[in-house]
Every structure is written in C-alpha cells, then in structure tokens.
C-alpha cells in the first residue's frame, strides 16, 4: 500500500502543471479581430489571418496552425463566420459578437487618452519654471496652450479621417454598380 499512496499526489501535481493559462485571448476573438482588421469585401484568407495573429498575439507555434484550423471550422459551423471561396468573413452574428467584445476594449483606450492629456497638462508648468526670463514664459505658455489645442485638433482630424475612409470605399462601389 505504501507505493500506491505517493503515486496519487504526483498525478494531481502533473495534472495542474499540464494546464497553464494561455497568454492570448480565445481563438474566436483573435480570428474576428484579424478579419475585422483587414476589412476585405471578400473576406480574409487563412494565411492572412495566421500572419496577423502571429504578429499581434503570443501563441504557441507548435500547435497554433492546427488549433486555428479547428477554430475556423468550429466558427463556420456555429455561424459566426462564413466561408467565401478560400476566405472567411464575419457573418452578421459574428459582427455583433465582435463589437460586443470590443466594447470594453474601446473604453480602456479612452482612459489612457485622459491619462496622457493630464500628463501633457502637467508638462507645460514644468517648462516655465526652468526658464528665468520673465517675458518669455508668458509668450511660451501661450504657445504651449496653442500646441495642446493643435494636438486636440489633430486627434479630431485623425478620427474624422478614419470615418471618411469607409465612406470613400463605399462611394466607388456604388459607381461601379451604376455603370452596370
């Protein structure tokens, strides 16, 4: 009986060691972000999805491709993805699920931007204290405020430019349809 007792705890210890938590999100999330990133009308190919995931996530290279193939098959069977020729697209359900998963992620960058804005407001007061000339700090303080305003305008322009790009893509497709 003595030898049997030690074998049981070693099995439990081995079982706990064999299940490390992955450092990446689920395959469904990774695949949907890869497809949404490319925004192709015909969908994204499997090699493109693999390339995006390997570049952006820390995945185990030995089992990654087989797990990805199985995940793609599972998502097509589930209805989250649709297969078009050799490409994969997000279905309507998949788009809703993807946006639901990105909801909390979109809130986090907003918090980061507020942190960076507080850092930028903290930086200008530090610069006038270093400068000894009394006339220059007032002029430079005004220039820093204009710089922060310009930075805010630039960020607004960036968001506007992003919103204009999809509209520009839609317009040529409508013209092509009109020519037919």
From Swiss-Prot:
* GO MF, any single term: structural constituent of chromatin
Per UniProt, the ranges with Low complexity bias are: 1-17, 112-131, 139-161
Could you confirm whether the keyword Iron-sulfur appears in this record? no
Please, which domain of life does this record's source organism belong to? Eukaryota
* A Pfam family hit: Linker_histone
> A GO BP term, please?
nucleosome assembly
What segment(s) does the record annotate as region Disordered? 1-25, 91-180
Report biased composition (Basic residues) as residue ranges: 162-180
InterPro entries, sorted: H1/H5, Histone_H1/H5_H15, WH-like_DNA-bd_sf, WH_DNA-bd_sf
On whether Mitochondrion is a keyword of this UniProt record, the answer is: no
Q: SUPFAM superfamilies from the xrefs? A: Winged helix' DNA-binding domain
Q: Please state where this protein is localized.
A: Nucleus; Chromosome
One cellular component (GO) term of this entry: extracellular matrix
Q: Which PROSITE patterns match?
A: H15 (PS51504)
Give start and end of each H15 domain. Answer: 23-92
Q: What modifications follow translation?
A: Phosphorylated by H1 histone kinase (HKG).
Which controlled-vocabulary keywords does the entry list? Calmodulin-binding, Chromosome, DNA-binding, Nucleus, Phosphoprotein
Summarizing the function annotation, the protein's role is: Histones H1 are necessary for the condensation of nucleosome chains into higher-order structures.
Under what name is this protein listed?
Histone H1
Which organism was this protein described from? Dictyostelium discoideum (Social amoeba)
Q: What is the lineage of its organism?
A: Eukaryota, Amoebozoa, Evosea, Eumycetozoa, Dictyostelia
Gene that codes for this? H1
């Amino acid at each position: 009986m003595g030898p049997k007792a030690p074998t049981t705890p070693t099995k439990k210890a081995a079982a706990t060691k064999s299940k490390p938590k992955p450092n990446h999100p689920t395959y469904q999330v990774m695949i949907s972000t890869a497809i949404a990133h490319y925004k192709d009308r015909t969908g994204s190919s499997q090699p493109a999805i693999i390339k995006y995931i390997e570049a952006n996530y820390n995945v185990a290279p030995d089992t990654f491709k087989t797990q990805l193939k199985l995940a793609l098959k599972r998502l097509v069977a589930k209805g989250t993805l649709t297969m078009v020729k050799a490409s994969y697209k997000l279905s309507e359900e998949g788009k809703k699920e993807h946006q639901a998963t990105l909801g909390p992620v979109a809130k986090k960058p907003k918090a980061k931007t507020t942190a960076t804005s507080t850092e930028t407001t903290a930086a200008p007061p530090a610069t006038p204290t270093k400068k000894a000339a009394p006339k220059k700090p007032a002029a430079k303080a005004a220039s820093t405020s204009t710089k922060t305003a310009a930075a805010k305008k630039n960020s607004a322009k960036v968001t506007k430019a992003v919103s204009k790009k999809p509209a520009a893509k839609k317009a040529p497709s409508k013209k092509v349809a009109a020519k037919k």
